[in-house]
Amino acid sequence: MNGKTAECENYSDWKDFCKYTAMQNAWSFAHFALEKSSAPEEVKNLLEQRFASVVGQQVRQEFFQGAIFDKLDENKIEYLPIKGSTLRALYPHPEMRVSCDVDFLVRQEDMPAVREALKSCGLEQDTSCVGADHDVWHAEGGVTIEPHKSLMSLTDFAGYFTDFWQKTFPVGDGSSRMRLKTEDEYIFLIAHAYKHFIHGGCGVKTLCDVWLFRKKHTDMDEEYVYTELEKIGAAKFDKKIVALADCWLGDAEMDEESEILTDFLFDGGVYGTDKSSALMGTDAESVQKTKRKYLLKRLFPPLKSLKLRYPVLNKCPFLLPVMWIVRIFDAIFTRRGTIKRNLKDCGSMNEQDVEKAKKIKEIIS
């Protein structure tokens, strides 16, 4: 990514390396970093196999993405590609940047027509994931497509993105594809990362996205970016993430804060863990209060969270207590593994975890 081959002559814990690579879904990164290194051949062979698998998945995604966007163009439906599909071009090799799904934004009033377009492309809607802000559709080969009606949800700053359509403009090639100016694209990148970070973690891909974005767009209006990020409380987070990215991929030296953030990002996987989400999501001063708040939040989630799982709450919010009971019984009969995992996470929390979470929040807030 930065043109360097990893130095690993004195490294020996390859089992741990592969574990963290899997947690971060970073097989492509690892493959390119180690293919010409002195890493053991069995490790490089494993990375090559995993790399071939994720590239195959990416090819399938791009096929369906192209078909869907062509159909939207044909029907004059404006759309804004977001997340991985817009960031891939920043990488030295596009196949380095893999995505779990294909995301794009459409206007809420266009969603019925978008659904018809997806059906005509051979996709099937996942009716168990009907949410307030996006649909989930599946295609053969394990491809997932997510058309969004809003850029952000379930955050205190979601309102900032309500009218983001006003900041879009046509790409100018005669299609219905829209784009954002560079600064607004970066603001969404940071806001999306910040949302995941404060809910448990955002993974190493985010650091790479930020570093490469800034490396390509050196002429951004930094005053505008800072002012807008201040509005959503993410300006300091941006500063710390940029500094950390420069430690990882540039020439900056790691300090104590960088080490703390690095450990948090690596341990959290792509989107963080339930445990880290619980620790980051409470302001409790003790481990017992943190555990209590965590269990209460798991048993009785707020209205905005359950709207995604139970769309009836959008029109009838007074049914929230009923949906709490429905959700509990649903978990008992269909998601016992989740219950066991949540109880295990709660039981493993200690004072050190609480102090670490407090330190991380101090660094970015």
Where are these regions (language model features)?
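Conserved NTP-donor binding/palm subdomain of two-metal-ion nucleotidyltransferases/polymerases, i.e.
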Residues: 1-100, 106-365
